[in-house]
């Protein structure tokens, strides 16, 4: 894999990268589309979204892995769902696999190896180190190494590190472990990195973002290559049912150094009383706000060129809340995707105007704007003592 810096903005961390992997070429910033066996997934519905990279996210726990090792029916079911997800990717799209594994007491070490054998389809170009959780760090390292070793035998497959939301000292150890794997395995990358924001976003989890930015700046110098940052499980915020409009903190990602925006694959279990009050939010890329659906209808949002999913279509579905929620999500994904080339064009044509473009997004709150400025300062401002 080759990662090339095309252009970067002035005063912000927004940039344009070209990522080449074999015959695949992906330009950033980019919104990755999620694919699954569900026909209504992001990659399965025809929209105006610029394509380029598809992510397949698969969740396991130790029990399901153990069953998969001994139950042929369960193996066949997973194979079918996995194959169905892959078919939704187009020929010119890069496919990234992102496993998540909850480790419990009945965990078998070999199950991670068997999982890699089953999931490594020839169409998969890139696999993320699994998001391991519910286990002490030594156990996580042990399973990471087992998984990487098993994947290292696959032809034409690249393995990318995943930064998980751990404690600072644990994150330091995790990066060192990845550097060891990079030195040992030729198909282990360090110029492409996944970051699990775990139902949050780079603004709300600035501590995690800052750690990644600080470390990738050093690593980039060591490997003599830019490092593409692919954020997964990004969500615009929590408890947003209380407001009629909330800032699009997920859409801020490209301005703070996240090159590829992934979907949120971690649904939050909600109490019934919350579900009853939950309001459908619609993205307006003109002001970077998520608006309540009824407000969006009255606001008459100017939709970006290339939109295939429109507010008029959503209005026709408003009587069916379940279906309206499904299509509202697709609507938002399409609008996020269409915004990425607009950001890219401004960066390439006039890097000094990116700041002005972002300043014009009126739904962003002061804290979000401060974080965007702070991210740039934290990466590029070097403070030294004057002697």
Feature map (PLM): residue ranges:
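Eukaryote-skewed repeat-based solenoidal scaffolds used as protein-protein interaction platforms
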Residues: 96-98, 102-278
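Non-catalytic, usually N-terminal nucleic-acid engagement modules in DNA/RNA processing proteins
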Residues: 1-156, 321-387
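C-terminal accessory extensions appended to soluble enzyme cores
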Residues: 233-387
